[in-house]
Amino acid sequence: MQIIEITEPKQTDFQQKLQIAVGIDFGTTNSLIAIATNRKVKIIKSIGDKELIPTTIDFINEDLIIGNNKGLHSIKRLFGKTLKEILNTTTLFSLVKDYLDINSSELKLNFANKKMRIAEIAAEVFIYLKNQAEKQLKNNITKAVITVPAHFNDAARGEIMLAAKIAGFEVLRLIAEPTAAAYAYGLNKNQTGRYLVYDLGGGTFDVSILNIQEGIFQVIATNGDNMLGGDDIDVVITQYLCNKFDLPHSIETLQLAKKAKEILTYKESFNNDIISINKQTLEQLISPLVERTINITQECLEQSGNPNIDGVILVGGTTRIPLIKDELYKAFKIDILSDIDPDKAVVCGAALQAENLITQHTNSLLIDVVPLSLGIELYGGIVEKIITRNTPIPIAVIKEFTTYADNQTGIQFHILQGEREMAADCRSLARFELKGLPPMKAGNIRVEVTFAIDADGILSVSAYEKISNISHNIEIKPNHGINKTEIETMLKNAYKNAKIDYTTRLLQEAVIETEALMSSIERSIIKLTKLLSESEISIINALLDNIKDAVQTRDQILIKNSIKEFKSKIKKYLDTKLNINDLRKCKNSNQIK
């Protein structure tokens, strides 16, 4: 993200007093809500004087109970997921198996005596947070800045925004959790340099590389895994306790595991009447999970060109485990920053940003980055990347495209996400068609396509044909989610297949260019039959047949050689009798079928 300077109209003192905005960290394990006043952050406490509110929802005696660590939990992992994904993912299915409505065509849970969507259930948590804030602040709260994992896709972002809207919030901004944490450190510490944000929460792991210079935050790279967090560490410890002490797999054993984990962050051993476990055993159990986070961090550094890192910012309660600090220092030999409570860093950043957006304390805005490239399918299945990976947002990019065939009155647009060169290897986001175009020769139509991503990471695509003034707009809301593991896999596949993809693209471009050449020549022969003798037509047709045979082989060198032979043998016709302007247009334009 990058802070950019924007001057807004000045507000009166009265208007400023009326406006209150909160920051919300909707976590997998715990949620927090806070408000900033004059850049000082206050965490809103719940009933029982708790700042960390468990993100759980229970239904008891016709009442919804938030934060009792029973009932539905880890709801955040379900944002942006389809029923099919839930059924095919063991970890996700285990979260909702007791509530899942498998007869529904979409993801719904049987909860609180009715069928509810994930956004409706999550809204209850937002309502609870809102009510607690209004009680303490004695004011109506309607505006909020909400944090999300860096790799939340459009579907997940849209669902969390819907949940907040149902709860009565106007979402001023969605910002990435690592971004919010870095923002909190940037304003409080005035750090300058390149920093790694290591965010290991209850259910997700995010890592970001940030360049911080005098209040300017620039994201260099992001990576992560939304199926890895403190919850997974709890499961490993629980499994050990069950096997070692013959305990049942129950909520009580899980709570015991969590308590042991917390105690061992500052003591060498934990003992009670039921179990006994020491710090060394804990570290042996969780070492593979910690190593996974180190590997993901290393990949993120490599993607950003291995810059010199000035420090590591720790975020998430799980980072209190001493092994994590030890392994980070061992791997990267850099200072670990943890001055701000890792459980509160994200919500502090969100609250500070919320204050920024409603007051004149600063003109700064936070900007995130695009996790995967976004593009459009060209004729032949080639992908034209419009917005590349790690581009700061908000962003708008305009590119011009044209038609492939003569008298083409419609263009089909296929929006894609990914790093591969061919559409078949990328993720399909949406399709739409621009109809009613004026019938013209291939290459003469000009269509402006705009890809725009707003500050919340929502993509919209518009197409505008200049001659007829026909336009079409679409907001991209993918019908299924993509988690950070899938993003990591897509990136690995892109790197692994880079050479093959590039060769495939060059071949396909050669085929398209050749087909355009043959089409142009064949049209010219028909128009100019009176200017060409039968023998000349026979020579040209024979050479065209050679090109067609070369195309069938899918051999790029053979195709190029056949075109070279064609041009050399009929050079005199190219310049005098055959019109190949269409070919030049096709070669230099982005064509869409």
From Swiss-Prot:
Q: Is Cell membrane one of the keywords UniProt gives this record?
A: no
Q: Which domain of life is it from?
A: Bacteria
Biological process (GO) annotations?
iron-sulfur cluster assembly
Keyword terms, alphabetized: ATP-binding, Chaperone, Nucleotide-binding
A Gene Ontology molecular function term of the record? ATP binding
A UniProt-annotated Pfam family: HSP70
Q: Does the keyword Aminoacyl-tRNA synthetase apply?
A: no
> What is stated as this protein's family in its record?
Belongs to the heat shock protein 70 family.
PANTHER family per the record?
HEAT SHOCK PROTEIN 70KDA (PTHR19375)
Q: What does this protein do?
A: Chaperone involved in the maturation of iron-sulfur cluster-containing proteins. Has a low intrinsic ATPase activity which is markedly stimulated by HscB.
Which named protein is this? Chaperone protein HscA homolog
- Species of origin: Rickettsia prowazekii (strain Madrid E)
